[in-house]
Amino acid sequence: AMAAAAAAMCRLDEHLDLTKRGGRVVCVGLGSGALPAFMARKFPTAVVEVCEIDPVVAEAVRGFHGLNPPKLLGPWGDKPVPGNLPPGVGLCMGDAGEFMEKAARAVERGDAPLASVVFLDAFDGAGEVPSHLTSKDFLEKCDRVLAPGGCVVINLFNGPAGSVQRRRLETIAANLEAVVGAVTTFPVEFPVNVVLAARKERADGFGDQEDPRFTRKELKSAGREISKELQFEWDAGHFLKKAYWVETEGGASFKERPAGLSLNPLSGFVNRMGTAMSDEWAREQEQEM
């Protein structure tokens, strides 16, 4: 869902279409290597930079997904410059906060291009996204690297309404909205995860587009179009057809509504919609553990 959301959102912005303009993709967290490898394989003119702090993870990924060996970069000093890389995957071992700060400075000096997408798919030993990577301070660094109209895409653990996981997700959504721009959520096949995507505002707005967020219809169509064109192994539109627009009112609340659909806000049906994990699904998971 992360790759699907990013590919479709960039496709819908003529200035950032990865199929036509190459571009720069930054991945915070290597994980299994599947995400950066997929982006590099399907968008061969794009520069895909990965920041990973754990050498064990990096070593485990070598030999998989065509990342054998990845281009090793850093540790970052003033040079080499983040962003000044040939197409393909480059790996930087080190702290993500330091990496993003130096990447932002490089952009501001004019030594590196802006990024079309920043992916955040990093988890600690306890299976949680480190809190400093979802703070306003870190997201501001991401925003400094991001091109206008570009997106920050985050993979998070989900939970039932009112759960610790869900409250944290709501806080992160509020931070994203405050720092980067309008937020859209995407459910995944199994509700244990949810994807958040924030689109950066443009200084001059978005022209004739009344809302900077994309509708379900637009996302689904763009996803299916790009999947067919680039021969994805799966239908990106399938992952995007249940997108939700998020409204946080500055962190005072958290509401999801079907992206681009007009529904009666007083309807009880609206309150049952969204990406929150159902209580029944959560109970089933607990019983299996």
What are these regions (language model features)?
Residues A1-V179, P191, M289:
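The AdoMet/dcAdoMet-binding core of the Class I SAM-like
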Residues G22, R109, T184, N193-M289:
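SAM/dcSAM-binding transferase cores
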Residues F123, V188, E201:
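Flexible loop residues that form catalytic
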